[in-house]
Amino acid sequence: MTIALTDKNTLRETARKNVDQGAVTEGYDADRQEVLRLLNDSLATELVCVLRYKRHYYMAKGVKAHVAAEEFLEHAGQEAEHADKLAERIVQLGGEPDFNPDSLSSRSHAEYKPGSNLKEMVYEDLVAERIAIDSYREIIQYIGDKDPTSRRLFEEILAQEEEHADDMADILEGL
């Protein structure tokens, strides 16, 4: 059985067209503007999560605060890595990552809820992770096979968000 792939000469010729579009080739099937919007909204979500986790790290108090604070700091770093990867993908697709602090909160899937004590902080972090999980699942479904690179990026981030939610659920149970 022979698979019908594009012949080499056609691939070479097509690759020379629209070179100014970088990684976005004629074979890109997704609605690029919509994917860029989803990536930028997810970038806002990750940045809001970084800020919330950082605040919680510094504000955690109580007998069991040490364990939670370590998780808050670790998660803040991982959320920042997610933001960096999303920003890189936005640029690869010819967009501009939106780091505007004035609109972060309104574009973020999750809200910035500071919490007034350790239990509320952990609870709000768990809620935010659950929101991110559902948002990223929907984005993965929407993208499907039209943009495998963005889909894989969201799948990687989703896996870590699920770990974060599990961590927060464990800590909350112990409070």
Task: Give the ranges of each region predicted by the language model.
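Iron-associated oxidoreductase/ferritin-like identity signal
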Residues: 1-175
